[in-house]
Amino acid sequence: MNDLQIEIEKIFKEAERIWDSQKYGDLKTLWDEDDPNPFYLAEEQADWKIGWDDLRKYWEPLPGKRMLEAIRMRFYDIKIKSLSDEYVFAVGWVRHDMKMRGPIKAWGGDARINALFRKKKEGWKFIAYAESHKTPVIYMQELYGKWLKIP
């Protein structure tokens, strides 16, 4: 594994730690705060969050209050492509498991991710991030593939 791969994976590990802590506002520390318009798309969102106001409202809709009883995010199978000395593109997967407060049952799933990073003095920082779930057709194909084959 090369040094750049290790550096990018460390950022994802820190994101996992922050999600686990439920101090979502701390995610901002992983982003290029000089970028006026960061892009963010979570798989459950209908549209992009663009700009710091949108990101803050997504990460901390009610500052100091937690709607989740527990959350666990795990990034895996990260692959990177250096675009220049200043930019790196990354793809991979995220596994999320969460439990909302109240009677709602826990749930989880896997989603594809991609991210764009910019090199800063203090290291690599996110400038864009997106999650994309599989389509229903792909889910069905995978389910059919798991069925026992009947002769």
Predicted regions and their residues:
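A short local loop/turn or secondary-structure capping micro-motif enriched for an aromatic residue
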Residues: 48, 98-100, 134-138
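A short, structured loop/turn motif at beta-sheet edges
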Residues: 80-89, 117-125
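Outer-membrane beta-barrel domain signature
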Residues: 102-104
